[in-house]
Amino acid sequence: VEKLLSLCMIVKDEEETIDRCLSSISGLADEIIIVDTGSTDLTKEIAYKYTEHVFDFKWSNDFSAARNKSLSYATGKWILVLDADEYLNTDDCERFKKFIENEQIEQNKVYSISIISYVGESIRNANVTESTMVRLFPNNQGIHYFRPIHEQVVDANGILLSTTVSPITVYHTGYLKDTVQKKDKHNRNQAIFSELKQSSGFIPYDYFTIGNEYATKGDYKKALYSYERAFKKAAPNNPWILDCASQMFTIYMKFNRVHDAWEILHQVFSHYPDYPEYHAFKGSLYEYAGHYSLAKESLLTAFHNAEALSRKTDRFFLINPSYGSIVPLSRLLKIAKVEQNKEEIVYYCIKILQANSHDFQTLNTLITVLLLKESESAVITTINKIIINQTQRDFILLHKIFLSHGNKEIAKYYENKIENRSLISIEDLLFSSIINSSEQQFKEALLKLQPDNADNPKINLAIMIATLKWQNPFIDMLVYNENQIKAEQQLSMYQKIINNTIAQQDIVQNVTTVHTLLSTLFELKQFDLFDIYIDQLNHPLVISLLANYFYHNFETNLAVSFYNLLLEQNKMDDSGYINLAHLHINSGYSADAVPFLEEAIKLNPNGHHLFSLMLIHADNEDIRKRYRKQYTSLFAQHVKLPFIKQL
């Protein structure tokens, strides 16, 4: 019987991830080929649990050589290439199998898969990026890899192949900080690049991959230099040129080189107006410059173009499917927040959550707005429509969010759905007892404290609030880690608040701690305590932070009253003036926003978007002339942009 799929992998010291990878694919692959380049851990022993085809290969600083060795052992009709730090969602395996069973093999036709990478400290705190890469192709056609690093797939004559999108997604954890450091990937890759430069010199693709290396390390100056060299030397039909231009655009924006970003946008992406990338990039540039109406128009076009194309083809994007979904939707949500448009906030939150129901920040934003305008039963109904087939993980997350909003009824609703109460965190038990006014429940939760709870600052915050609420010295139970100096400072600060002996200088030095305490009291609906301690901890810095907190949480009347206090004392900062300007613009009183924008620019002349807002909303020509001149002197790159010139 002909084997349908051969999985080919090269590995070295992958004992922490290879089992996850192989278990995710073992039900799909008819043959698993493992080429080991020198493991000293249990990698091979784990691999032997899944296959007898484990081969040793002497590492020669050449990924292509190792990859091609693995391909030489494959006997399946199709070849899939994975790395050990990648894995499939097992629910997708049946769809994958149907695809390769039904797909007609054509000469020199290769397939890209979608790779979702987690980048950051850990999966929980990671940023998620999505890219495509050729990993699936028919066997026995001479298709092989070339270049020692960031290897590419070519045909038997060494010619790059055209790529077709496959409906396959894998997940990649190799960019997590611990993995990068442990495997010393950057130094390993640098050594390979050095050898390559000495032996044969660099081709444009090498400069592109070197740029990727620097970008991963966060060295964007060197990354941009490499990307620019690659872009300048490359043929316009190179398959990676769009990725290179995208990276250049992103770094230009990071360096405030907006005109250069505009140029690369139109030089490359304007040729693809039916795809989302052009409009998503343009929308992000408009938003950055403070031109929100143009930004919304472009971002909506990106989203709608992707929707229209996706009904015709799987390949509805040029670089990354997120440019047709999460990227424009997230930016549209951000603008809706600036404009305080609750209907649009709800709409965009729901759209984002339909793609990723575990986006904590977006879910929290949605719930914040829903609780302002909907009954508790209506809120639950909306959540249940978004998060379908809810799991225990969902109940725990929703319980946590509604606790943070001080909504004990809905929090209790989701708590009752949690089957194993031991999964509820100590933090959530403590806050639950506070909003339910149960001192006994709080005491019982305290008994569960463990030394590792010292790394959670919210536990100490809950203990402090309980001390104030019940006038009980729970503060003696504060938990700390090895940072003794910081611990003593926090304890001293809390003691002064409790004893009403706090000085203004103490507040200045600990303003974040004070603001967190007061805003949490408000969130938990401990209004009596809030009123007491806002008087005791009254300081312009605290009032400013609270005013902004109220404004961004749609407590407009409270925000305005706090801003008025600051105006009376002449203590308003630029963020307050900006929020008041937006408040007037959003209410249709653009002329009244101008004085607030003027004050904001005085305090923050580096706020480039403020000048756009001024030129858009000011009617007085003398004012416009003055700020156009200042804008030109401070931001020469900006005023070269066509849409800025027209203001």
Indicate where each model-derived feature is located.
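Acidic helix N-cap motif at the loop->helix transition within catalytic regions
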Residues: E16-D19, D41-Y50
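Generic helix N-cap/helix-start motif at coil->alpha-helix transitions
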Residues: G201-Y207, N238-A245, P273-H279, G290, ...
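Short aromatic/hydrophobic "clamp" motif used to bind/position activated sugar donors
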Residues: I79
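Catalytic-site signature of metal-activated, phosphate-bearing donor transferases
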Residues: A65-L71, L82, N89-K222
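Alpha-helical repeat scaffolds
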Residues: L224-R229, H259-F269, K296-T301, K342-K351, ...
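Short, well-formed alpha-helical segments that are part of the catalytic scaffolds
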Residues: C8-E31
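A conserved acidic beta->alpha catalytic loop
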Residues: D36-E45, W59
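Short beta-strand/loop segment that forms part of the nucleotide-sugar
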Residues: D30-G38, F55, D83-A84
